[in-house]
């Protein structure tokens, strides 16, 4: 092989290797910043079509309804823990260390974004509450499908009295 061909071959191999390295780093960065949406049932039982469950340490978004009576606040800090459930019976505990949105209430729909812990709790970095009684985030509405039922607070209050 003459020196000119050898130089071209070395340059081509280096160029292909560089492009492959850049592509793999780009895919790794995109994958680590990807936030997948799950319902509480999908976290507990896995996705319905694939059976895939999120791994501990994975960054995810969870949408569902805040379970009535599940909210526990720490009186000395902003730490709050509550459960989120869906119509299929799945439930996950969420911890949050910041101010909750003004519209956050038990029995309301929310979307929480954070990291799934080894213990199955979601350490939320962001909690979004729905706007009014008719609004539901698109991901939550799609995931809950036709099984979502609006809570009737008047019946709950009369039963409690």
Swiss-Prot record:
Domain of life: Bacteria
Keyword rRNA-binding assigned: no
UniProt keyword annotations, A-Z: Cell inner membrane, Cell membrane, Cytochrome c-type biogenesis, Heme, Iron, Membrane, Metal-binding, Signal-anchor, Transmembrane, Transmembrane helix
Membrane side Cytoplasmic: residue ranges: 1-8
GO biological process: cytochrome complex assembly
Region (Disordered): 138-161
GO cellular component, as recorded: plasma membrane
A molecular-function term among this protein's GO annotations: metal ion binding
Topology feature Periplasmic, residues: 30-161
InterPro entries per the UniProt record, alphabetical: CcmE (IPR004329), CcmE-like_sf (IPR036127), NA-bd_OB-fold (IPR012340)
Annotated residues for binding of heme: 131, 135
Predominant cellular place of this UniProt entry's protein: membrane
Cell compartment(s), UniProt: Cell inner membrane
Record Gene3D superfamilies: Nucleic acid-binding proteins
One Pfam family here: CcmE
Membrane topology value: Single-pass type II membrane protein
TM region positions: 9-29
Role noted for this protein: Heme chaperone required for the biogenesis of c-type cytochromes. Transiently binds heme delivered by CcmC and transfers the heme to apo-cytochromes in a process facilitated by CcmF and CcmH.
Protein family according to the UniProt entry: Belongs to the CcmE/CycJ family.
Protein name as it appears in the record: Cytochrome c-type biogenesis protein CcmE
């Amino acid at each position: 092989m003459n020196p000119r061909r050898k130089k071209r071959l070395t340059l081509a191999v280096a160029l292909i290797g560089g492009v492959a390295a850049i592509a793999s780093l780009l895919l790794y960065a995109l994958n680590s910043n990807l936030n997948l949406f799950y319902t509480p049932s999908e976290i507990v039982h896995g996705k319905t079509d694939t059976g895939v469950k999120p791994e501990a340490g994975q960054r995810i978004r969870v949408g569902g309804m805040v379970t009535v009576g599940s909210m526990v606040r720490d009186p000395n800090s902003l730490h709050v823990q509550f459960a989120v459930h869906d119509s299929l019976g799945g439930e996950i505990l969420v911890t949050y260390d910041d101010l909750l949105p003004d519209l956050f209430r038990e029995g309301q729909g929310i979307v929480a974004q954070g990291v799934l812990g080894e213990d199955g709790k979601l350490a939320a970095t962001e909690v979004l509450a729905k706007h009014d009684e008719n609004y539901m985030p698109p991901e939550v509405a799609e995931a809950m499908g036709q099984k979502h039922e609006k809570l009737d607070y008047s019946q709950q209050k009369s039963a409690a009295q």
